[in-house]
Amino acid sequence: MMITADFAGVPVGVGLSYDSYRKFFEAQQTEAAPAASVIVGEADRRRAAGFYPAGSTDAYIEYMELCRRVSDVLIPFRRAVFHGCAFIWRGRVVLLCAPSGTGKTTHYVRWKQLFGDEIQILNGDKPVLFARQEGDITVHPSPWHGKEGMGQPISAPLGGIVFLRKAAENTIRRVGAELSAGILFRQF
């Protein structure tokens, strides 16, 4: 079945062979004509299966591979799916970035405990970033919310990116463009 989902203003046709993950696309479904379309065929799923944990279902592999393909078709539209936990604080998005298992969700939960209703989750795993012509970046939801299922259909301008790494002590410091570029590119 082919559905059309809105990714930061770009309608993309998404081919779903399995109904089990369709619910994640519902908040972004649109009747607009797709600007691009993606599908993960059976041969593609078989090739990709080795990159996923043993026992991963074909439906799960399709769902995750669709993420990569959607990101690829969004690039010409100045948008990309980005790996990070995005939440809104004081009107701007804080994007927590780190390899899987580092503690992005844990860090978000701590912010939520400290700031309560000032914090709104946007997407817990893979938001869409839109680099506007004017130079600012806005952050938008995607169907890929992560294993915790955190996300809602809201968007806001990017306020900052926090790179996390495990350490014995909590510290924060500003990093320069040279160091941050390498870290950023691993998040796409």
Where in this protein do the model-derived segments appear?
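Post-Walker A alpha-helix
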Residues: 107-108
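Interdomain "pre-motor" coupling segment immediately N-terminal to P-loop NTPase/helicase cores
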Residues: 31-47
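Conserved lysine of the Walker
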Residues: 104
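Conserved AdoMet
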Residues: 60-62
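Glycine-rich, often acidic-flanked micro-motifs
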Residues: 3-23, 35, 43, 56, ...
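Phosphate-centric recognition/catalysis
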Residues: 49-55
